Regions:
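Non-catalytic terminal accessory/regulatory regions of metabolic enzymes
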Residues: 1-166
Length: 166
């Protein structure tokens, strides 16, 4: 039939990840953004985990860490007025979700291209000076409705549905 066939095993070792306790930069301002409208990405993750048999609730928040050199309030007001970091028609600044049986995971990209682009836009297009650093991440809030919290969280993290370990 012309198709070469070999008899061997394939193996793949996933890279291991470490969960670190998040320590906010004391010199930075955190903005936690919630959505007014339905978050389709969180709904999809919730649905996929439900199909895997997990009785959990999922919400997602966007996390911005904004470092400025001085004039913090003035700079933050300018950033807010641009609408670059969130769309005030669909989103609003809130607090990190806290609830019983809930764990929150801040996930950041290794190459944070989105925050780099927003930083350039704020400093060049909007000419806001004194922004020293901008970091973006996603906070996944996982509420375990039934079962052992730690065991279920470990299983969910091992699915890599909340982040790409590579």
């Amino acid at each position: 039939n012309g198709n070469p066939i070999t008899n061997h095993f394939l193996s793949f070792d996933r890279s291991h990840y470490e969960i670190e306790k998040y320590e906010p930069n004391p010199d930075a301002t955190e903005w936690v953004i919630d959505m007014i409208i339905t978050d389709n990405e969180a709904v999809s993750v919730h649905s996929a985990l439900g199909q895997l048999g997990y009785d959990v609730s999922i919400t997602r928040q966007t996390h911005w860490e904004i470092s400025v050199e001085d004039e913090r309030e003035s700079i933050l007001q300018k950033i807010d007025a641009t609408g670059e970091l969130y769309n005030s028609n669909k989103e609003f600044i809130n607090e990190i979700t806290t609830a019983d049986n809930t764990a929150s995971f801040l996930v950041r990209q290794k190459d944070d291209m989105r925050s780099r682009a927003k930083f350039e836009s704020l400093t060049e297009r909007f000419e806001i000076e004194k922004i020293s650093e901008l970091k973006r991440g996603v906070i996944w809030n996982v509420t375990v409705n039934s079962g052992n919290l730690d065991a279920i969280l470990k299983h969910i993290l091992n699915t890599h549905i909340l982040f790409n370990p590579l």
